[in-house]
């Protein structure tokens, strides 16, 4: 079976694979971040969101994997075999967990649409030859908070901006009213 854990969230394993493996923080740092930001929601019996559910499952699976790793470490007597198992877990499974934890924590922190736009932007940036791309990669935290991803189809008609009108010297509204309307 070929199961993509990101599909229902609008992303794919391939989209996350554009990010280099050293991009993702350690599992310990990601678990600490999830705990600091979302402990109450993760421990709650209430359903919060699909991202919370996925994060809960990833955290539980990581715990089980660490239990297995401890068992292997205690019961596998050959040091070379033990090192191979630990290396495999850290390299392959560790990266998958780091990607999964990062994705769901980022979606909860920045919003799913922003994270997906970031992944697409980074994917475009990394595939563009160095001579033709900006020197710095996109950064997730600097993307606008209200990013609009346009659907394919008719593009909206562009309007030319109207010339600015000169303001009269006598204000029509009192200042206190204009401040209230900005909320």
Curated annotation (Swiss-Prot):
Post-translational note: Phosphorylated by host SRPK1, SRPK2, and maybe protein kinase C or GAPDH. Phosphorylation is critical for pregenomic RNA packaging. Protein kinase C phosphorylation is stimulated by HBx protein and may play a role in transport of the viral genome to the nucleus at the late step during the viral replication cycle.
Chain spans, region RNA binding: 177-183
Bipartite nuclear localization signal (motif): residue ranges: 158-175
Family annotation (InterPro entries): Hepatitis_core (IPR002006), Viral_capsid_core_dom_sf_HBV (IPR036459)
Keyword Zinc-finger appears in the UniProt entry: no
Gene Ontology annotations for the cellular component aspect, listed alphabetically: host cell; host cell cytoplasm; T=4 icosahedral viral capsid
Major localization class: virion
Result of changing residue 170 to A: Partial loss of replication
Ranges of biased composition (kind: Basic residues): 149-176
Subcellular location: Virion; Host cytoplasm
Family: Belongs to the orthohepadnavirus core antigen family.
Function: Self assembles to form an icosahedral capsid. Most capsids appear to be large particles with an icosahedral symmetry of T=4 and consist of 240 copies of capsid protein, though a fraction forms smaller T=3 particles consisting of 180 capsid proteins. Entering capsids are transported along microtubules to the nucleus. Phosphorylation of the capsid is thought to induce exposure of nuclear localization signal in the C-terminal portion of the capsid protein that allows binding to the nuclear pore complex via the importin (karyopherin-) alpha and beta.
Record's subunit section: Homodimerizes, then multimerizes. Interacts with cytosol exposed regions of viral L glycoprotein present in the reticulum-to-Golgi compartment. Interacts with human FLNB. Phosphorylated form interacts with host importin alpha; this interaction depends on the exposure of the NLS, which itself depends upon genome maturation and/or phosphorylation of the capsid protein. Interacts with host NUP153.
UniProt name for this protein: Capsid protein
Species name: Hepatitis B virus genotype D subtype ayw (isolate France/Tiollais/1979)
């Amino acid at each position: 079976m070929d199961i993509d854990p990101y599909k229902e969230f609008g992303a794919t394993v391939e989209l996350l694979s554009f990010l280099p493996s050293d991009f993702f923080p350690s599992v310990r740092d990601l678990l600490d971040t999830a705990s600091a930001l979302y402990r109450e929601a993760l421990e709650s019996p209430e359903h919060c969101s699909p991202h919370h559910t996925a994060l809960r499952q990833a955290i539980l699976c990581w715990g089980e994997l660490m239990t297995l790793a401890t068992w292997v470490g205690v019961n596998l007597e050959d040091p070379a075999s033990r090192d191979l198992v630990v290396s495999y877990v850290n390299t392959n499974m560790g990266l998958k967990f780091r990607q999964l934890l990062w994705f769901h924590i980022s979606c909860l922190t920045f919003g799913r649409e922003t994270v997906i736009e970031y992944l697409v932007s980074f994917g475009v940036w990394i595939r563009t030859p160095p001579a033709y791309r900006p020197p710095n990669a996109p950064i997730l935290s600097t993307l606008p908070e209200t990013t609009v991803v346009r659907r394919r189809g008719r593009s909206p008609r562009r309007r030319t901006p109207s010339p600015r009108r000169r303001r009269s010297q006598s204000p029509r509204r009192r200042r206190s009213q204009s401040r209230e309307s900005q909320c």
